[in-house]
Amino acid sequence: LFWRSFTHWLGGMGVLVFMLAIVPLSGESIYLLRAESPGPSVSKMVPKMRTSAAILYAIYCAMTLLQILFYRLGVLFGWGEITWFDSLCLAFGTAGTGGFSVRNSGLADYSAYLQAVTTVFMVLFGVNFSVYFFLLRRRFRLAWHNSEVRWYFIIIFGAIVLISANLLLTGGFFPTVFQTIHHVAFSVGSVITTTGFGTAD
């Protein structure tokens, strides 16, 4: 299961991008990077393609580690129970946006906190990674004016509001408003990023 999760994670950013980051490059490497990396403007990040690929993978790794850290904080503060093995595999499945889970029930067995962490990171891993590079370089205006990202979050927010309202008005699905919004947000994040995790029918 770990190997399956790891290869899933490795392919999330693209195996070719990984290779570009660690092996000598030719003049044709720009085409590989454009084809394999998420986001249309990655080639404009820095002049050298190898540097661009390394930056993308550094961001990808840092976000994966951050998700694992939030899982472990949940265990530390008693907000949920999850093993190190499950933490790693779920983080890999979230980062790869393919939703590979080590349990048959997906994330339904985990606490609301652990599900919320997964929701946030599903959405974050669905963002164009060049935007994170711009944020790291403090080019906030360029990141903010990215129409792809703005519409991405507008669609997510709108879907959560509309679906939650529909479920609350029809009634009987979840016992509380919080649980309704919680499960809807998770499902919307899962669907829009094609991750495919589930918490409820």
Placement of each model-derived feature along the sequence:
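Membrane-proximal intracellular helices of multi-pass ion channels
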Residues: 1-201
